[in-house]
């Protein structure tokens, strides 16, 4: 998120603690001007951080009315957030929700606390809470006695005033999901994100990444479910086409579909539009790898079908495109070695296996084993058939 957007979001969070905030969703607590409560709040806002907590305690004790307790809890949340005492912020945030369940700014504050703490579980719990509050507000009918046109205008203005907070929540959620270290949890968070923001480019991208994460978590059924769901909505999603072409070809399943997906990905790689947030060099590298990956899957399909000459053609084309990705390059050369062996071209196979063993990847040891076998075979005289 840009620094400007972060600053705006944080300013809105601070502004939410002012009395009768117009951007607030939930209860509006009116603090009479010049009242004792008003003076106490002014003193809290002006106080040095080291003195704020005692003043907030005094305000909470001297104003037991439930509405004023809402204000007190808001002050506690703000104080503990600034002090980075996140568990205390959560404690008072829950107290605030008990008094004011639709307090949107409190939900945003809880998202902020969870994001800063790195608590992904709470981040998504409160993110879903924030989105639910907004959704309910958007769907709410006009209050009794309110003209529908006036209500539409008021609601639009309020939603516009909350746009930066809404953007902050969305970006905190997607950032938290991508940063989750456990692939199974990362996938689940991305799916939850997609449900909160359906029919958006961010949702589709999140699901594509979720499918890959499910595969990393060795949950192939969920990978297939999510990946096929993405393709049902966007048949040209190159990331998912590559994922499924790779999976099917490697397993020797649905080879015709794998070949179709791989060929489609090759074609799409030449027509994709570069996003604004990526350099020309980075973009060229990405589409080069994508095209090479697709060609490697084509080659693997041919290998599975015992079409070794076609496999050599596709894998050789992929070879030059995958050099910047050690893992994909090594696997491609390993496959190419077998394609050459099937054609009885030992010298070419040896070269391919040597290239596979030359980079640091899981295929190095396997390629070295094949090279040892080929070396032994070359030195061992062929057994003659009995006459």
Regions found by a protein language model. Give the residues of each.
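N-terminal leader/linker segments that initiate helical-solenoid repeat arrays
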Residues: 17-75, 83-84, 125, 137, ...
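Terminal, low-structured helical/coil segments at or just beyond the last alpha-helical repeat
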Residues: 27-32, 165-171, 188, 275-277, ...
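"A position-specific structural signal for the A-helix of alpha-solenoid helical repeats
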Residues: 38, 75, 109, 171-175, ...
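Structural motif corresponding to the intra-repeat A-B loop/turn of tetratricopeptide repeats
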Residues: 46, 83, 117, 180, ...
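Short solvent-exposed coil/turn linkers within tandem alpha-helical repeat scaffolds
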Residues: 62-69, 98-105, 135-146, 160-164, ...
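Residue-level recognition of tetratricopeptide repeat
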Residues: 78, 112, 178, 212, ...
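TPR/TPR-like (Sel1-like) alpha-helical repeat modules
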Residues: 112-139, 249, 259-270, 316, ...
């Amino acid at each position: 998120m840009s620094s400007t957007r972060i600053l705006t979001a944080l300013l809105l969070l601070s502004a939410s603690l002012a009395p009768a905030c117009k951007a607030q969703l939930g209860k509006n607590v009116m603090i009479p001007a010049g009242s004792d409560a008003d003076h106490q709040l002014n003193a809290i806002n002006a106080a040095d951080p080291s003195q704020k907590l005692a003043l907030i305690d005094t305000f909470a004790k001297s104003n037991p009315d439930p509405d004023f307790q809402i204000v007190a809890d808001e002050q506690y949340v703000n104080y503990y957030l600034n002090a980075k005492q996140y568990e205390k912020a959560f404690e008072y945030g829950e107290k605030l929700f008990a008094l004011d369940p639709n307090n949107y700014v409190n939900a945003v504050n809880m998202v902020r606390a969870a994001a800063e703490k790195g608590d992904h579980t709470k981040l998504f719990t409160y993110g879903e809470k924030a989105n639910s509050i907004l959704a309910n507000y958007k769907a709410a009918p006009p209050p009794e006695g309110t003209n529908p046109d006036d209500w539409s205008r008021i609601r639009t203005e309020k939603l516009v005033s909350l746009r930066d907070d809404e953007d902050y929540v969305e970006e905190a959620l997607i950032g938290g999901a991508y940063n989750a270290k456990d692939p199974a949890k990362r996938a689940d968070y991305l799916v939850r994100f997609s449900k909160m923001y359906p029919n958006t480019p961010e949702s589709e991208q999140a699901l594509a990444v979720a499918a890959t994460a499910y595969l990393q978590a060795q949950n192939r059924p969920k990978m297939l479910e999510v990946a096929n769901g993405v393709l049902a909505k966007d048949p040209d999603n190159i990331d998912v086409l590559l994922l499924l072409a790779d999976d099917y070809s490697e397993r020797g399943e649905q080879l015709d579909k794998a070949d179709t997906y791989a060929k489609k990905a090759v074609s799409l790689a030449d027509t994709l539009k570069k996003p604004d947030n990526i350099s020309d060099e980075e973009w060229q590298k990405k589409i080069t790898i994508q095209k090479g990956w697709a060609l490697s899957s084509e080659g693997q399909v041919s290998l599975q079908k015992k079409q070794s000459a076609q496999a050599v053609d596709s894998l050789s084309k992929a070879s030059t495109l995958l050099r910047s990705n050690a893992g994909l390059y090594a696997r491609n050369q390993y496959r190419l070695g077998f394609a050459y062996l099937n054609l009885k071209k030992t010298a070419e196979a040896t070269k391919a296996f040597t290239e596979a063993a030359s980079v640091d990847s899981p295929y190095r040891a396997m390629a070295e084993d094949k090279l040892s076998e080929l070396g032994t075979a070359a030195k061992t005289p062929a057994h003659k058939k009995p006459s």
